[in-house]
Amino acid sequence: MLMLKDRFGRIIKNIRISVTQRCNFRCFYCHREGEEYISYYEMLPEEMERIVKVAASLGINEVKLTGGEPLLRDDIIEIVSRISRIPGINDVSMTTNGFFLEDYADDLKRAGLMRVNVSLDTLDAEKFRMITGVDGHESVVRGIIKAVKANLRPVKVNMVILKGINEDEVDDMIKFAGDNGLILQVIEFEGPRIDATYEKYHVDIADIEDRIEKRSIKTIIRSMQHRRKYILGNNTEVEFVRPMHNSEFCLHCNRIRLTSDGKLKPCLFKNNNLIDILGLIRKGADDNHLKELFIEAINRRRPYFFNGNL
């Protein structure tokens, strides 16, 4: 089997697929998976399946489904089912805002989804409404609990730290995670571009991480992006995601992205090096041609942050 390796020696094992740009939330900080354009085109389930089959033949074995909000797709169960059955794919997961998760968790598990990440930045309903534009805090919490019961484990809660809004809630979120058998991911506010929103709400989470590290009984450094995970005394796991101006994060990135309209995207932070794989599928390209497109996309990868922007 071929192994995809870029010019910097990074082996690509993960494809992150945005299945839609649509979302029922309006989170003011959302980076939209780096898609800085509006597209009304979406891939069909069989088109995603074919792309993932090609990816699997090149050694990619992990698939993350994202959006937008993936549960807005009426055919999301079919998408999960098709992808989970592909030989060589051994991990299929999803990032969701959790609003519809209570209704979908059991069907997603039966279709082959293994685990979920759920976005939840606050335990305060009013703050939640301010961040998302939706009165949906209780629905998301119920979705998280249902995901645990459906055995979509580990269930990870993604908490983006926003200056002046939720820095003081980390300890409460750790308790929530511990009480419900969750992993907490503390995430630095990231953005493909530095704008007024970023300047207003971005905060360096190093101080928070230092505090949690001192409380931990064990530290694990993950191979993916060299993320640090801390095990606390009650066995609660807290992982830190610090992408901005972080050369270690970039140098150990093992993923490629597929946009909702079928373009291979080598880097979250760049939009000038996309490859339109869906367009060629719809023109009748064979699998060998699609493999060449993957290889070309991998060759376009370079660490965005490496002692500054390369």
Predicted regions and their residues:
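Short, conserved beta-strand edge motifs with alternating hydrophobic and charged residues
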Residues: 158-160, 185-189, 222, 240-241
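Flexible, acidic/Gly-rich N-terminal and inter-domain linker regions that tether
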Residues: 1-16, 22-26, 205-219, 305-306
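Accessory C-terminal segments flanking Radical SAM cores
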Residues: 192-306
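Radical SAM/AdoMet-radical enzyme domain recognition
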Residues: 45-65, 69-185
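Residue-level signature of catalytic and energy-coupling elements of molecular machines
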Residues: 19, 184, 262
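Canonical Radical SAM [4Fe-4S] cluster-binding loop centered on the CxxxCxxC motif
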Residues: 7-46, 267
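A short acidic, helix-capping loop that chelates divalent metal ions and anchors anionic groups
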Residues: 34-38, 124-131, 193-198, 276
